[in-house]
Amino acid sequence: MVAMTMASNEADMLPRWIDYYGGQLGVDNLVVLDDNSVDASTDDLPCTLYRLPGPPWKVNWERTRRSLVNGLARGLFACYDVVVFTDVDEFLVPDPARYEGLVHYLEGRREQKVIAPLGLNVLHNPAVEPSLDPSLPLLAQRRFVKFAPAMCKPLLKRIPADWMVAFHGIKAPFAIDPDVLLLHLKYYDVTALRAVSEHRRAMHETDSRGSPHSAWPLGPEALTSRLLSWVETPDGHDIPEFDAAEVDLTEIVRPKAKGFYRTHGPQLPAMDKNPLRRLPERFLKAF
């Protein structure tokens, strides 16, 4: 099994990604695509690194990224049975009550050609959660989550079917498996969110990255305000734990006219609507 990501100036998140997936798969089975970082975050990495040429590209950034990753994935199937691609802030965590890790989880799913995790956004509530203590697991310090249908992305595959639409779709049928979570850390820390959202807004304006209808064009003020509205609660300890049984997964994956399947549902409206939950206790030591 090999895991890939693409990173641009991710000094905060890239070390977390390498530490987690390196612990799951071994750093020799990680591939980082460096999208023109200038913050030294990709210097002296312990895993395979490819430095990408800068813009202008032949096509837009999203199509360039997708073509690169799909091409690499097809080649990697010469050496691996499973290829995974995640954004640098996305962490695939099988249920610790049932699995020792990703490898153990996949051993029991050899017949599933494409797997999508159940997506949760990890949210920071600064009213009750202080700054991170690096000596403690991150998830033990960031307990709040919301179900995000759009984050149920088909990221694990055993076949060279091409990913589509920013990796929310793929040219093969797939199902969402609640036994593995995708924990999305974009909103895990207010200070980090401000920095990341400013960086992404600048890239959206200069290189047209990200959809105009996504969070990319929104700056730190708008996204911080939305995050605080999502976690607003008189007492965080009264929030129940997330239970996959409370969400309907049957209508999220839909076939599209061009012969691929994708998850349905914009992320920001889902965050406004879906109830706030706590990450179950058994996940708190995952990373």
Which residues fall in each region the model found?
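Catalytic-site signature of metal-activated, phosphate-bearing donor transferases
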Residues: 62-67, 96-287
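Active-site-proximal specificity loops/subdomain of glycosyltransferases
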Residues: 38-85, 94
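Active-site beta-to-alpha loop of glycosyltransferases that engages the nucleotide-sugar donor
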Residues: 5-16, 36
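Short, acidic, metal-binding catalytic loop of nucleotide-sugar glycosyltransferases
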Residues: 19-28
